[in-house]
């Protein structure tokens, strides 16, 4: 647009923010800055997409496209270069984000923290990626690709707020009783501080970037609300019955204070943007906070997403935007088209979103082009051949594992590759499924069911996709094969009734429905499905009762509202049908069947123009709706004086009718049965047993710990921390080592490494501990990176060696240099920080395990005062040590090389301690 029309545009993302949390705070006057924004603009719900996974959603927000077009299908993707898996990245995205489009038009942009934005794209402006929370400040270390331009890495990296820098003044507003928390048993405070420091870091960076340079567009993403909700929504008021009063009192204020903190940050962001800026604040989904909060997490990767609510929040404010108004029917794919229109730029016809014209005081001229992908010029994207930094990939993967979004396959690249490929296929299939492209979803679900016949989530999605696509007979065959008895899961019981109606008629469906146990239908989440079944079976009064209750349970349940509109239409309650349909599309616009219902109701009410508009909207989303074409043909011919439109829709209706007849005659179900033979399924009980084994719940993990009655002696620690010496000591004292002698003694370890090659893969540990004879009577050396993967069912006595980290780093570096392997040039100070973080995480884990007894042995004290340390080892191992007096016989101070100058971090600590 012309230079004189340019104004700053600020896009703010609050992941997981929900009006259900915000409205009470607004009513109490506790979010004054958001209140001011609302007074100057519009607000509304922002419908999410399926699956509700943040990397997919925020890239849809930034592109205006569904994930099958932008290419980000979840958290992890298969790594074709190195094997294994890597996080989805800016290189995974297949199309231009809004900042790439603006780059081509000469705009200057800031992008901070956006999902899958690493490595930073070379746009006109500045980018700080979602890798910024991995920055280390002491010493300063910014991962490559985190900041663009790279020369600003030190400047912006220095803004990183470390967790240890937060004080009680920062923490107590969120957790007033933080001082009462036993952090050895409760890890939540530690996790909370990490998330809060990340949030403060993002705010510091974005405000610095807004302050110190000319910019036209700034996009900033905060994950704090989402992370806090995943950690603490269970404790949000009102207290649930299963939540202990003491824990509730500790954490009940976290989420409320998080929103207030974001409101404080918002004030500074708005100040820097200026009064004439266009501001759009949104979230990608909501978060359950009331009676619909789940009691558990599904046994699947990305299981925590079950907490996500389908409605996020949306606020838009600035010159030309309506004031203090509500907007209905917005979807997160509408954000980019709306911003482009507001900036006077054309919208791509290939964008799945639409311009939210209702936000504007005066509807702007909406120009379109076929696709921004076809527009030449510098879009500030990575050149072909750009590679992913493997270190970044590994660090971010660990973060996803810690958050519960991906499975931990560290040490097994093949399994990591398979898991990433599986979840990407599953998520893509769900994109097709949720956008009603069942014929594209079905082959993906079929492939997944063939590979993983024990995964009910794949089986159930395939069953529903077959039913919705009209393959009723095949759907019933699949249900019978997967659930051979009379029992089926309650949600599939409804699907089975739908399929029976499609294959065998209404009477058979009615019998199947009446055979469903009443308790299976009583759950609030089942009311919508029950209402839909009753409507299909002609029991309209009962259907209306169920659907009304579903809407009362969840006032944003657009699907229940749409089905209720259909019931009202059948009951000839035209006005109520129109009202319910408008309420439904006001929450989610992309519902062609509900727009069709609205058109039917408006037609009955005597509004032909409005009815035609509703039918046209329905056809814009689903061109193959025979009824909409038929109605429009009649309306345009008889009431709206549009003979061309009438003829066009008449031809379309006739062609669709012909296709329907041909499809019925071709025997679609028989064809599908031939193309995809049903696999052999384990029984539901066997599938559940496999699922429990593959993905245990935290409660089951606790029950399993130590349950075998077997106990093992483990020596662990960082490489080069004294583990080999401890193995020698135990051998001298009569506790034989489990070693194969494959790794020979050398200059670095003249007396040998005392290692067991077979134990160097975490995937092999269960089999090794269960099948190796005599292992309980031996000492086993397990490196610190694997000690957290010990099989849960056994008990362990772990001797963990501690050595000053500077000594460990120097010893490792010199050993690597002598071996001439990779890594010898790594900065020692940076290595010390990495080792410190790793050791802290390992020890934190070990100290919290009820099946692990832990003895910490400090290497300098072992050499300086062997008698005292040997006494501690003797007491710790007890009868497992036949000749304890021989422990100190192998200690040779001459082998203590790479000593720290001027002492160490452990010099004031005792030589050993039990945990």
Predicted regions mapped to residue ranges:
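PAPS-dependent sulfotransferase catalytic core
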Residues: 49, 124-131, 678-775, 889-899
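PAPS-dependent sulfotransferase catalytic domain
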Residues: 779-882
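Substrate-binding rim/cap in mid-to-C-terminal beta-strand-loop elements of soluble/periplasmic
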Residues: 267-270, 296-346, 362
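Metal-dependent active-site segment of extracytoplasmic phospho-/sulfohydrolases and closely related
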Residues: 11, 33, 257-298, 339
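The conserved 3'-phosphoadenosine-5'-phosphosulfate
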Residues: 346-362, 742-750, 826, 830, ...
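Histidine-centered active-site microenvironments of extracellular/periplasmic hydrolases
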Residues: 276-319, 352, 368-372
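His/Asp/Glu-rich, glycine-adjacent segments
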Residues: 65-246
